[in-house]
Amino acid sequence: MKRNYVYFLFTYLLTFVVSGCDTDIEPEVIQAANTYNEEYYQNLREYKKTDHAICFGWYAGYTSEASPSQGLHFTGLPDSLDIVSLWSGIPSNNPAYVETSYYNERYLPTAYEEMNYIRTVKGTRVVMCTICRIGSTEFPKTDAGIEAYALHLARCVLRNDLDGLDLDYEPEGDWLQNDNF
């Protein structure tokens, strides 16, 4: 009888131990993405059209498309950002574009979609960034060369349907500095 009681107790405990084991990995939301309704985004777009202090920022972290971090995605930028300057090239949806593209386009389809999302949904303007440096280009160091360089930059903005150009003036001895700027 005592032996049957031990077997019964062992079987009873084993049943709970086996049924209590859960080997399935259960996804757990640690931090859910903020979601807003269309009214919020409409108000945001309308606010950005008003006369207000502008929030401008440079952004270069969008080249790691597989990252789970929102800090590496356009969608992670603050809603209050009015203008963002592209410091890592221009995201493109065209696989023919490579990093050495004449217009500095880069094939980054996810970043391209996210960039268009913040433009259309959040009303954030996106501008191309370049440092005024004509000496390292094929443009001649003349007034005509400066004009050709300006046309090149304008074509780059227009070709990629961007909202403008961020010309960075960083004095470092290039011909397109000082009196020629």
For each feature predicted by the language model, list its residue ranges.
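Chitinase-like catalytic core of GlcNAc-active glycosidases
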Residues: 51-181
